[in-house]
């Protein structure tokens, strides 16, 4: 009998912390399904979801302010374990009879927590814990039926608990890696306190997704826009495992891909894995549509519209295709729901977040819509996709369309492709590729004087860009070794005829963005 991987579940109520999605990812890593909802969810929705435990996230607001967010009262009436993190602890304390005050000694950064009481949360952990704090308010009086579990030098109630009701509050962030044993604390809550078993594994996710696709589409045919990126590639493998030749992939070569990328996609999915692929070489069509346009936002829209037109044309040739498969992932669902309603809710609502036309009259197959990116990569490995493809640096949807600054020309794209390939190759050779979060080359539409042999040349400029980041919301420029940068520059100038100068971008985000356009 197939295990229902959704049988055990944790509900995370989002109070606005930048770390909330990280909490959800940690719960998934423990092997338990969870969903992320807005803090002001209806009681009936919580009842229907029937969680085994509830986590109250951190947030930027102050419990001491009037009209600041509060957990629904049903959270504390439901009888399930509750874990409050930072703001979540503070609202729990205040709602259950304790007191919160704005502290004169704010805690941001590392802190040493001294465990002074017994708690299931600290099972198998030592009495001193290094944790990550980020708070201005603090609990100054705990509810009468709670006990103090831990403290820091400036925070008298760093952890509180009502072991009988299985309520726990921590003033620090267990979800971040800076809290050394934070994962163990979350495991103690999810596995020991809530009684979950860890049914959410890569193998079980694949089994569930394949079964769902089979049940959803029956004997119908399915069409998928295959880009060669992580999400569409994993969807292709799942759908092919579920329905075989009833899946048709459309791969559009827009002329804005990386060096040899189109050949690599066709070789892997067509020859190696045996998928049905329609290969549309549309380079000239995209270049014609982009001719004379230099505004980056307009370029993005043109590229998107041309792709949709081509995909629509190809789908109409497949008379029996009743379903459209998409690589929608959970963060897309959260963002799409929030943009429509102001709330991160609910995973079952079907938002078409892929930008394809509403009049295609096809049902949506979205086997990844419950998954975070790291989960998608893990199941991709399990499905046999190569590591270097799944863990490749991010590549923008419009491709080189936003890495060639200004107007797009074939000459510029060809030069950029070759220069970028050299940069990436040398990063691999120097064992630096996996030490930076993203690296790429940008084509600048300016000419610069150079010297080659006894002659002068007046050719184009490219910029190398490499950044280090955790979440891509902020980023530092990567301090690559000078001799490495020198080698890359020399190779590009000597091997790519048409480029006379290479520069290195040392801008952080903010104020700059990671991509130039």
Curated annotation (Swiss-Prot):
Listed PROSITE patterns = GATASE_TYPE_1, GMPS_ATP_PPASE
Which EC numbers does the record give? 6.3.5.2
Q: Got a GO cellular component term for this one? A: cytosol
Where, by residue number, is the active site?
86 (nucleophile), 173, 175
Q: Which residues bind ATP?
A: 227-233
Q: Which residues form the Glutamine amidotransferase type-1 domain?
A: 9-199
* Record's function text: Catalyzes the synthesis of GMP from XMP.
- Please identify the protein, giving its name as recorded: GMP synthase [glutamine-hydrolyzing]
Chain's gene name: guaA
């Amino acid at each position: 009998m197939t295990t229902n991987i959704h049988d055990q579940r944790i509900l995370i109520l989002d109070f606005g912390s930048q770390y909330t999605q990280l909490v959800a990812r940690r719960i998934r890593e423990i092997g338990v399904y969870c969903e992320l909802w807005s803090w002001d969810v209806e009681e009936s929705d919580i009842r229907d979801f029937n969680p085994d435990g509830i986590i109250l996230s951190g947030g930027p607001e102050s419990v001491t302010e009037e009209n600041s967010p509060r957990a629904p009262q049903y959270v504390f009436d439901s009888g399930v374990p509750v874990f409050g993190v930072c703001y979540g602890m503070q609202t729990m304390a205040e709602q259950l009879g304790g007191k919160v005050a704005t502290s004169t000694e704010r805690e941001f950064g590392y802190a040493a927590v001294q465990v002074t009481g017994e708690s299931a949360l600290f099972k198998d952990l030592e009495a001193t814990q290094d944790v990550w704090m980020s708070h201005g308010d603090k609990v100054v009086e705990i509810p009468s039926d709670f006990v103090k579990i831990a403290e820091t030098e400036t925070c008298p109630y760093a952890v509180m608990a009502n072991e009988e009701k299985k309520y726990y509050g921590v003033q620090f962030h267990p979800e971040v890696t800076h809290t050394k044993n934070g994962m163990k604390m979350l495991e103690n809550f999810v596995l020991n306190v809530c009684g979950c078993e860890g049914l959410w594994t890569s193998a079980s996710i694949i089994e569930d997704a394949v079964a769902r696709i089979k049940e959803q589409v029956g004997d119908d045919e399915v069409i998928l826009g295959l880009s060669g990126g992580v999400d569409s590639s994993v969807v292709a493998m799942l759908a092919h495992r579920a329905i075989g030749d009833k899946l048709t992939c459309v791969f559009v070569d827009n002329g804005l891909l990386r060096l040899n990328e189109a050949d690599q996609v066709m070789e892997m999915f067509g020859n190696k894995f045996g998928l049905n692929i329609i290969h549309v070489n549309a380079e000239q069509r995209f270049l014609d549509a982009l001719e004379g346009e230099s505004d980056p936002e307009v370029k993005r829209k043109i590229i998107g519209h041309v792709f949709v037109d081509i995909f629509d044309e190809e789908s109409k040739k497949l008379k029996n295709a009743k379903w459209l498969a998409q690589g929608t992932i959970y963060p897309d669902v959260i963002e799409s729901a929030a943009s429509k309603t102001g709330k991160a809710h609910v995973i079952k609502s079907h938002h078409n977040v892929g930008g394809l036309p509403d009049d295609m009259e096809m049902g949506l197959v979205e086997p990844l819509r419950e998954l975070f990116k790291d989960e998608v990569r893990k199941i991709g490995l399990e499905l046999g996709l190569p590591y270097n493809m799944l863990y490749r640096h991010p590549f923008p949807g419009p491709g080189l369309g936003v890495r060639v600054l200004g107007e797009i020309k074939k000459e510029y794209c060809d030069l950029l492709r070759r220069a970028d390939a050299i940069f990436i190759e040398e990063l691999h050779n120097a064992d630096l590729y996996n030490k930076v979060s993203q690296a790429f080359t940008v084509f600048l539409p300016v000419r610069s004087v150079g010297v080659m042999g006894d002659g002068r040349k007046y050719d184009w400029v490219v910029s190398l860009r490499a950044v280090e980041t955790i979440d891509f919301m902020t980023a530092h420029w990567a301090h690559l070794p000078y001799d490495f940068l020198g080698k890359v520059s020399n190779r590009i100038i000597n091997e790519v005829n048409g480029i006379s100068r290479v520069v290195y971008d040392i801008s952080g985000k903010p104020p700059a963005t990671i991509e130039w356009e």
